């Protein structure tokens, strides 16, 4: 074990079929995009239903270091008013701490282009392994200077803004194969460039394209003008003064709904999540369809004017054969937990980029599935999970690798496998500050 065997959390078994309603906090992806866009405007913006977790708190801390005010409502900490710097320029000669948050380390560096001095970036030691170079290469193409204080292309580093930004349309080419966040980080700030931006992705595949579409929709919603040519892998953004509406409500995090809705397939019974949007740019919006393919009954009832996603399972799980998860790789750990109990093998493909997430998620999933007696192996672009007899599965102390989705993965296995203990379940605070309470509450209902 690479983590200390302290504060082990015994994952609770599901003693009976579930019948639970679980309210999921706001979307991390949308919360951190809205925070960036609010900071790039000229007027205060109140964000309602903002996720409060380590990642969003790190984002607010980063913005405050740059001179942005983030005022938390005294009545509810999920309402935050963001006020950009009065001068219209971000503070330089400051330190930004990114923790292990990919959205912070890849979205905030772009703001340094508009700072009045150098900005230093650092993070958790584990963050030093996360790739950063494409977005930083993009900023260098825009005239910034990047000084690395460790390995090139990784934290820690200092960004010095250029004396002047390009007056003509900027031409930037990067290989974003490792993460869609490299493209999103540049698109978020592109409208503020004097001549706008023409951004080209030079890699063969574009990972997590729905996340890029989310960014495009959010930039457009703030007044930006983006022309996307996904087949050519290019995005052209006009220079515009962007401003979010004075009040913006954040959708629930549909990817964080995956462990709870997926629990209905593993344990049997029904789980409902309220405030499910009719349309969404979140990749987690694909989840209900995936669960249906695995054998769940899925419906979207409206109760008291609120739209729910309702998932019912009977404890049986259909394997999926070859299954392309390119569009929603972040829910791969939750789907993997369900597929451990499937009737046939599944090859989840299109998710090679998960090797560069909080941990190497493909390697971690294989390790932990094998740890409980399951059968799994890495593929060049994904993961194979094969069925095993139920009696082969057994309890274990499970690693989480400081990765929130590996912790929720372990909890899902614990619904059906006795004696699962989870190391550092507190890592779920990255996106679900009360995961343990929510999970226990689901089982008590």
UniProtKB/Swiss-Prot annotation:
UniProt GO molecular function: 3-phosphoshikimate 1-carboxyvinyltransferase activity
InterPro entries reported in the protein's UniProt record: Enolpyruvate_Tfrase_dom, Enolpyruvate_Tfrase_sf, EPSP_synthase, EPSP_synthase_CS, RNA3'P_cycl/enolpyr_Trfase_a/b
Location in or out of the cell: Cytoplasm
Subunit structure: Monomer.
Organism of origin: Bifidobacterium longum (strain DJO10A)
Catalytic residues (positions): 330 (proton acceptor)
TM ranges: none
Predominant place of localization: cytoplasm
Binding-site residues, 3-phosphoshikimate: 28-29, 33, 179-181, 330, 357
Keywords on record: Amino-acid biosynthesis, Aromatic amino acid biosynthesis, Cytoplasm, Transferase
PANTHER family in the cross-refs: AROM/DEHYDROQUINATE SYNTHASE, PENTAFUNCTIONAL AROM POLYPEPTIDE
Gene Ontology CC entries for this record: cytoplasm
Name recorded for this polypeptide: 3-phosphoshikimate 1-carboxyvinyltransferase
Role description: Catalyzes the transfer of the enolpyruvyl moiety of phosphoenolpyruvate (PEP) to the 5-hydroxyl of shikimate-3-phosphate (S3P) to produce enolpyruvyl shikimate-3-phosphate and inorganic phosphate.
Metabolic or biological pathway, per its Swiss-Prot or TrEMBL entry: Metabolic intermediate biosynthesis; chorismate biosynthesis; chorismate from D-erythrose 4-phosphate and phosphoenolpyruvate: step 6/7
Reactions mediated catalytically: 3-phosphoshikimate + phosphoenolpyruvate = 5-O-(1-carboxyvinyl)-3-phosphoshikimate + phosphate
Family statement drawn from the similarity comment of this UniProt entry: Belongs to the EPSP synthase family.
Binding site for phosphoenolpyruvate: 28, 102, 130, 181, 361, 405, 430
EC main group: transferase
An annotated GO BP: chorismate biosynthetic process
Enzyme Commission designation: 2.5.1.19
């Amino acid at each position: 074990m690479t983590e200390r065997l302290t504060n082990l959390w015994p994952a609770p078994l599901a003693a009976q079929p579930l019948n639970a309603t679980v309210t999921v906090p706001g979307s991390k992806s949308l919360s951190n995009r809205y925070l960036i866009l609010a900071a790039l405007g000229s007027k205060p913006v109140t964000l309602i239903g903002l996720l409060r977790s380590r990642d969003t708190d790190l984002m607010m801390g980063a913005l405050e270091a740059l001179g942005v005010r983030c005022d938390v409502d005294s009545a509810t900490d999920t309402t935050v008013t963001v006020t950009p710097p009065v001068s219209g320029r971000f503070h330089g000669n400051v330190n930004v701490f990114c923790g292990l948050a990919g959205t912070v380390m890849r979205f905030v560096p772009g703001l340094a282009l508009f700072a009045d001095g150098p900005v230093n970036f650092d993070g958790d030691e584990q963050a030093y392994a996360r790739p950063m170079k494409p977005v930083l290469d993009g900023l260098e193409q825009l005239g910034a200077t990047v000084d690395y204080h460790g390995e090139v292309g990784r934290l820690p580093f200092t960004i010095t803004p250029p004396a002047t930004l390009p007056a003509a349309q900027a031409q930037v080419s990067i290989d974003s194969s490792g993460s869609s966040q490299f493209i999103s980080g540049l698109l978020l700030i592109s409208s503020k460039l004097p001549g706008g931006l023409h951004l080209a992705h030079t890699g063969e595949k574009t990972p997590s394209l729905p996340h890029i579409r989310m960014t495009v929709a959010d930039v457009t919603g703030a007044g930006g003008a983006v022309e996307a040519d996904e087949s050519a892998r290019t995005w052209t953004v006009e220079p515009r003064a962007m401003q979010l509406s004075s009040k913006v409500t954040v959708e629930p995090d549909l990817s964080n709904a995956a462990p709870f809705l997926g629990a209905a397939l593993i344990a049997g019974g029904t789980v409902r999540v309220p405030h499910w949007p009719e349309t969404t740019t979140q990749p987690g919006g694909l989840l209900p369809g995936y669960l249906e393919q695995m054998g769940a009954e899925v419906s979207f009832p409206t109760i008291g004017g609120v739209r729910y996603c309702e998932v019912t399972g009977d404890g049986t799980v259909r394997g999926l054969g070859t299954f392309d998860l390119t569009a929603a790789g972040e829910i791969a750990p939750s789907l993997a937990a369900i597929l451990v109990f499937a009737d046939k093998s599944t090859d989840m493909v299109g998710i090679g980029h998960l090797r560069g997430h909080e941990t190497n998620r493909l390697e971690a999933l294989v390790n932990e599935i094998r740890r409980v007696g399951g059968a799994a192996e890495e593929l060049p672009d994904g993961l194979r999970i094969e069925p095993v007899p139920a009696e082969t599965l057994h309890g274990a102390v499970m690693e989480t690798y400081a990765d929130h989705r590996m912790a929720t993965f372990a909890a899902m296995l614990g619904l059906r496998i006795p004696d699962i203990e989870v190391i550092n379940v507190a890592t779920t605070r990255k996106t679900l500050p009360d995961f343990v309470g929510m999970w226990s509450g689901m089982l008590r209902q």
